[in-house]
């Protein structure tokens, strides 16, 4: 509290306490409790010293200033060992409702910090020789490769996640990551689900594990179970983007695309730099399509294609949406691309009807593709 107003001490402490509570819900973060972190309050201490004394890799520090009915909160995330800034932000707010402002700043800070730490940890792991990695480092290397979405990177991600499990069979992240990799391969749904169930069994309070299980259940056609697991994840960690994403796609494929859209939009808003953004945009396109909002489906699919031109699924939704809009020539071009980018994916998604597709949604997609020129 740098405002000079003793009354703002409670406001500053409230924000700090709420951020500690919110961050502690993220399964990938180890967060020091209030009593220990508050022991540094008001002291001019070196961030490296704080890191050593608390045994943490990152330190979040901030300040509060008040002028009239306005308050300014600044926050910065620092890597304790090096003193390098990982993230910083400033929030200026009117104090009409002090608790609303406290909640708003807490949420804004929390949803920014978790992805920033994830990025920093992946970069840190990539700088280390593979042979020197512990389970956490192997997991982070796996996550880095997983985000690239190429066949080669998927193979490397699988190896690093398996190594994380071998190094620490009780480490939930290894099972979550390996399940995620297997979701990209054919004929692996049962193992994908088993790994996700193992993660949940190891830690029933891990929101990321429940989110992964939701997607594995959806891949097997269990729409109700998928929604239930995603909702459980959100109950544990309301700001976890992956949980909103899992719920969104599960709802979209369950005949509730409007509700699915709201969850998917929340997911993208919470983590706009998500390495899985192409999946989110593709899911946004299909949810809009199922809502019969074909213009919005085209927009979402084109956004995905601009960022990830080698990802096949958005071309399929683009072709179907353009077909429904009667934009035949554009639809034919998109259809050709959907087939040529990945013939196997097109065959699986279109001709075979994967388990996550209910007959009614699948027929709806086929109608659009036929209008785009697909002859079956």
Label the model's feature ranges.
Residues 122-125, 335, 365:
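Generic structural signal of hydrophobic/aromatic residues within well-ordered alpha-helices
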Residues 1-325, 330, 345:
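Acidic, proline/glycine-rich low-complexity intrinsically disordered segments
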Residues 328-332, 336-342:
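Short, charge-rich, low-complexity interaction segments located
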Residues 347-376:
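Terminal, low-structured helical/coil segments at or just beyond the last alpha-helical repeat
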């Amino acid at each position: 509290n740098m405002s000079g107003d003793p009354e703002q001490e409670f406001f500053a402490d409230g924000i700090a306490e709420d951020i500690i509570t919110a961050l502690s819900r993220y399964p990938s973060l180890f967060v020091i409790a209030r009593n220990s972190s508050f022991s540094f309050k008001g002291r001019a201490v070196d961030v490296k010293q704080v890191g050593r004394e608390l045994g943490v890799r990152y330190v979040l520090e901030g300040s509060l200033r008040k002028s009239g009915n306005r308050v300014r909160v600044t926050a910065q995330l620092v890597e304790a060992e090096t003193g390098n800034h990982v993230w910083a932000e400033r929030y200026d707010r009117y104090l009409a409702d002090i608790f609303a402002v406290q909640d708003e700043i807490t949420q804004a800070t929390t949803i920014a910090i978790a992805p920033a730490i994830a990025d920093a940890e992946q970069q840190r792991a990539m700088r280390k020789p593979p042979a020197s990695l512990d389970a956490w480092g192997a997991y982070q290397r796996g996550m880095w490769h997983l985000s690239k979405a190429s066949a080669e990177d998927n193979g490397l991600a699988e190896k690093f996640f398996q190594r994380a499990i071998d190094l620490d069979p009780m480490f939930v992240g290894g099972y979550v990551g390996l399940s995620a990799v297997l979701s990209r391969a054919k004929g692996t749904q049962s193992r994908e689900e088993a790994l996700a169930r193992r993660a949940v069994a190891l830690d029933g309070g891990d929101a990321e594990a429940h989110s992964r299980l939701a997607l594995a259940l959806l891949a097997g056609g269990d729409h109700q179970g998928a929604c239930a697991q995603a909702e459980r994840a959100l109950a544990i960690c309301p700001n976890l983007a992956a949980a909103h994403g899992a719920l969104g796609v599960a709802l979209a494929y369950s005949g509730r695309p409007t509700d699915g859209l709201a969850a998917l939009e929340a997911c993208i808003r919470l983590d706009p730099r998500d390495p899985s953004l192409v999946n989110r945009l593709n899911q946004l396109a299909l949810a809009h399509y199922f809502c019969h909002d074909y213009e919005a489906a085209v927009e979402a699919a084109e956004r995905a294609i601009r960022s990830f031109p080698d990802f096949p699924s958005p071309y399929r939704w683009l072709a179907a949406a353009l077909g429904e809009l009667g934009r035949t020539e554009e639809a034919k071009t998109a259809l050709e691309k959907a087939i040529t980018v990945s013939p196997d994916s097109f065959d699986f998604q279109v001709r075979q009807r994967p388990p996550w597709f209910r007959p009614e949604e699948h027929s709806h997609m086929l109608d659009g593709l036929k209008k785009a020129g697909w002859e079956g």
